[in-house]
């Protein structure tokens, strides 16, 4: 058909393009005149195609159609007029001229909401159903016969923009094309509009959009969302006109803490909170507004209403200045009437419209590859200077999400100044615990107090879980792409690397870790872990599955891997940062949010990590850190109904209790890495030098505070005495001392209670008849130092043969030469199964032993060789679930099956 398109906007442009793709001939386009030198998108598109474009400011004069306009229209020979979006009054001489007449798109379910602000009134009235109508134009106001209608559900927090973008725009384009197709096929109906239910409302303007506070909260919410963006619902407060945007109903019934905002005429003062502005209806129910436009036109976060201009002005680098000038050129192209774009140039006051916002965002994103920029950012920073500041903060990963006031504890140590946060980290802020509760964290090197650390209470856990839940369900974390999530994790790993000396120093101070080992392992492997899982973010995928078809129809079945939600991670004290990283990296890569409970005795690197997440741009609430006791914080996380997964590393006894709590509370998913008594079998045909070296490492690595430490060494009889002699010789060479000294081999045990348990453990071994070859006592110096210890003649029934020391205690037992199956039986005669090892030159023996050992990891001619890509986790009462490797992702994902029939 020959079609004349009459209208404007991106919607009109899309309808025009789709009609041409359908094979229709668009003989002419009638649109609005250029505004401030900018042509409407519909006209621009048609001009590119060589289609005649007419830009009339009016079609009539004194109630009569302009003859020249009518003549030019009639010369086109159109068979149908299509009006996808038209703000002008078109004379009936034009409307009725074509053979098929004219069809009009209207964004409501006619006869309801006739008039120019139909979408606004759909929301203002709280309609549960919305949609659009395509009708045959007549001489009435939206009263013509219906050709086609489509409806959708109106969501409780829909705004004009969300409803338009989700349904009215994409489905409306399809609807217009379908309507034209029906006309071309001679199948288009003409259904008279019913009079029942017909309404007409006037156009919404700024002067009519003032909020009436004497109505329920839901009605106020509907008024605000119905006027969202244009014209904007407003009120007077603080001696200025405030316009509210982005409203949601608050159904929790709890009024958050905040600052009162008196509003004349309101039932109660508003409350400015961290989440936004709480408003009240006359029914005492609440709604939350997230954005406020001030009288000068500046848009701010409602939560910042009383903060003023809180952000300092950034000094731009040379590269950033180049980017700023490139962005200035983009502004100049969009704002041709502005002679020179200056820092004070306001995008909207210079004539920009909403379509220009889209163009600006897309051009800047193309200019700055990987940038996360949304339309809302332009409204929040409408002057060029503010926009550049916002842009640079985002590019640095130091935007608003990263701004936080931190009360540091500073110490001059290890030839540097370390700065350590010491408060709880909840919702992106460092805060005191409920009741200002604190506990001391102790330096195990000398027993001195490092600082007071906030001690989380049950109410703090609830706040942290609520922050994590909100970040997961409503925050930016769940909206960004998986690739962008990976980019943030890479940035976090880079920051950890930049701060690795500081992190390693804190590990030495707080946990007694030998500094050189902390650099390589505690911190180094943590960095590797985040980089490894950052790479997995955009590779988490489901599969398609062939199933039996429901003949004569067909089926398609697919699976999706989804994050589980809020996760609680409870970490031990032996590797404070590394254990955090092993679990948290996989958890975040899967798209979850997290509440981390570090061990009460070693909280400081976890809190430093929290600070780095802010600097990396991880959105607020995604990561929360709660130092505190296991009986309070760990228990509440296990019991909390909004926590969907617990990852725990610690003792078997506590792991059993956590598993029970997870089952009783809400059957939450759980993974447990628990105790161990890992056997290491050393055969006579081994490389003895290597066996001694690795045997030492298997026990004394990280002062023996190592979950996979070899809890018992089985040495073949013919090399037993020589092995023991060499081990004792090496032990006597070990330097026990300050973990910050570069030549120290062996630092202090983690805390005093653990030191006491080690002494009791050794006393137990001596009482039962084991031979104490060396060590077994506290080192006579300040701090929690324990001598590297070696026991021999350990029999299977003894306490030290069965129980884990979790310290620098080597337990050696003999086995008869060639008695392979007997030693395997003894090695497996434990309820633990975390790790194991074997030293032999015989590959057949190595393979046989690795098959038979009942442990999650078997080391052959090595020990402690973990890697971020290799799954880690135990069997039996050493727990279940995996850290590291691809397998770890499954601990933090759920699989959904979706089946289609067609």
From Swiss-Prot:
The record marks 142 as: Essential for catalytic activity. It catalyses: (6R)-10-formyltetrahydrofolate + NADP(+) + H2O = (6S)-5,6,7,8-tetrahydrofolate + CO2 + NADPH + H(+). It comes from the Eukaryota. Disulfide bonds: none annotated. In the N-terminal section; belongs to the GART family. Phosphopantetheinylation at Ser-354 by AASDHPPT is required for the formyltetrahydrofolate dehydrogenase activity. Residues 318-395 form the Carrier domain. Homotetramer. The gene is ALDH1L1. SUPFAM superfamilies: ACP-like, ALDH-like, FMT C-terminal domain-like, Formyltransferase. Residues 417-902 are annotated as: Aldehyde dehydrogenase domain. Residues 1-310 are annotated as: Hydrolase domain. The modification N6-acetyllysine is found at residue 882. NADP(+) binds at residues 571-573, 597-600, 630-635, 650-651, 673-674, 757, 804-806. Its EC number is 1.5.1.6. This is Cytosolic 10-formyltetrahydrofolate dehydrogenase. The modification Phosphoserine is found at residues 9, 629, 631, 825. The N-terminal hydrolase domain has an NADP-independent formyltetrahydrofolate hydrolase activity, releasing formate and tetrahydrofolate. The C-terminal aldehyde dehydrogenase domain has an NADP-dependent dehydrogenase activity. It catalyzes the oxidation of formate, released by the hydrolysis of formyltetrahydrofolate, into CO2. The modification N6-succinyllysine is found at residues 38, 660, 767. One of its GO terms (molecular function) is formyltetrahydrofolate dehydrogenase activity. Highly expressed in liver, pancreas and kidney.
